[in-house]
Amino acid sequence: MSTGKISIKTLLFGIFTLILVGELNAEESAGTALEESNLKKALYCMDILENRPDLEPSHRIEILRNECYSENFIEHAPNIEDGRDALLSLFASRYKKYPELSMSIKRTASEGDLVWLHVHVKHTPDSLGGAGVHIFRMKEGKIVEHWGVGQPVPKESKNNNTMF
């Protein structure tokens, strides 16, 4: 039989539950905001990297150096030298070799400090290009680590599915 009174134990449990739910929601919102910020920054950096032939190559490199890649950048792709300076040097040579280089982003995802981009890169407008996945670890608004995999887009496929 209910007397209409709430015990101190029940009241404290209710208060604790409300506080905990509020903290979890705040943490989730902060995590979501960080993930959105990391994704937005990675997309910005990839746009500067691959899709801005209107900018002088030296200006693109400076933007990438100052705004996108951490001084302590770590590269995991086995065909690319480690470090920010080596990576920026590679980009500078690519701009000379492939002045019509372009990239379209097909899919994105982010979780915590990681961002994934599924991309289609083309050296020239008429080339089939390549499919790639970039994984970036972000810290303080900059790319601090990169993992990448890629494969050429074939003329013919053994299935009816697209790579993108």
Regions found by a protein language model. Give the residues of each.
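Bacterial N-terminal signal peptides that target proteins for export
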Residues: 1-12
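C-terminal and inter-domain tail/linker signature
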Residues: 22-164
